[in-house]
Amino acid sequence: MRIMASHDTPVSPAGILIDLDGTVFRGNELIEGAREAIKTLRRMGKKIVFLSNRGNISRAMCRKKLLGAGIETDVNDIVLSSSVTAAFLKKHYRFSKVWVLGEQGLVDELRLAGVQNASEPKEADWLVISLHETLTYDDLNQAFQAAAGGARIIATNKDRSFPNEDGNAIDVAGMIGAIETSAQAKTELVVGKPSWLMAEAACTAMGLSAHECMIIGDSIESDIAMGKLYGMKSALVLTGSAKQGEQRLYTPDYVLDSIKDVTKLAEEGILI
């Protein structure tokens, strides 16, 4: 059921950016009605890009998860902070060497982009920080050595937490804080939503401009902020980090119980 609309004027975005964690999935669980909502949008002729700040997975891993949930997609219709980070480094720092505080998905995207790995932390030009769910002291200490040795810091995102089956789990902000504090260094660039890098990558994947798009997500700080900053329509879902009634820095165009209510917006002629 639709909870709130900031206006009743019908909207007709050509492209839809759909956040994954907290919107389509909660951990590994598919949120009820998500698959059907995506099918509805496709029947309406909408272009769809799946978007996530999760920097510990690759697009291939993400596609496998979506296919396993019965959601067809192409790897080129997936935009992750890991893939956008890799593309940024390839474009602007193609001869630089990186050290990674992160998991295999990020390593895979950097390799696909042709980004060079440093052989040891102190040789790194950049330290790339991302979510690391099996983090060890040795991992953290090697990242510290890279930053203390002068490596510039780029983070896939700076989310404080992300939704999973058990509630919320610590995200990249915890890893960034540990390195910045211990190495007395500052992160130079955060790639993930709501950055223009993510918005541009998503719009480019669809061949559309930002004002032709709508974003659906569970986070005020990343999803709705990105929509508002770059002229997209936005729909907030309450199946993830945002809760009904909380104060919001950015006001979404729509607030929905769940992504499944996208179907209701279409039936009511609000989304056309």
UniProtKB/Swiss-Prot annotation:
Induction: Transcription is repressed by glucose and by the binding of AraR to the operon promoter. L-arabinose acts as an inducer by inhibiting the binding of AraR to the DNA, thus allowing expression of the gene. InterPro entries: HAD-like_sf (IPR036412), HAD-SF_hydro_IIA (IPR006357), HAD_sf (IPR023214). Its cofactor is Mg(2+). SUPFAM superfamilies: HAD-like (SSF56784). GO terms for molecular function: L-phosphoserine phosphatase activity; metal ion binding; phosphatase activity; sugar-phosphatase activity. Its EC number is 3.1.3.23, 3.1.3.3. Optimum temperature is 65 degrees Celsius with 4-nitrophenyl phosphate as substrate. Keywords: Hydrolase, Magnesium, Metal-binding. It is an enzyme of class 3 (hydrolase). GO terms for cellular component: cytoplasm. It comes from the Bacteria. Optimum pH is 7 with 4-nitrophenyl phosphate as substrate. Pfam families: Hydrolase_6 (PF13344), Hydrolase_like (PF13242). It catalyses: sugar phosphate + H2O = sugar + phosphate; O-phospho-L-serine + H2O = L-serine + phosphate; O-phospho-D-serine + H2O = D-serine + phosphate. Catalyzes the dephosphorylation of C5 and C6 carbon sugars in vitro. Catalyzes the dephosphorylation of 3'-AMP and phosphoserine in vitro. Belongs to the HAD-like hydrolase superfamily. PANTHER family: 4-NITROPHENYLPHOSPHATASE-RELATED, HALOACID DEHALOGENASE-LIKE HYDROLASE DOMAIN-CONTAINING PROTEIN 2. This is Sugar-phosphatase AraL. It comes from Bacillus subtilis (strain 168). The gene is araL.
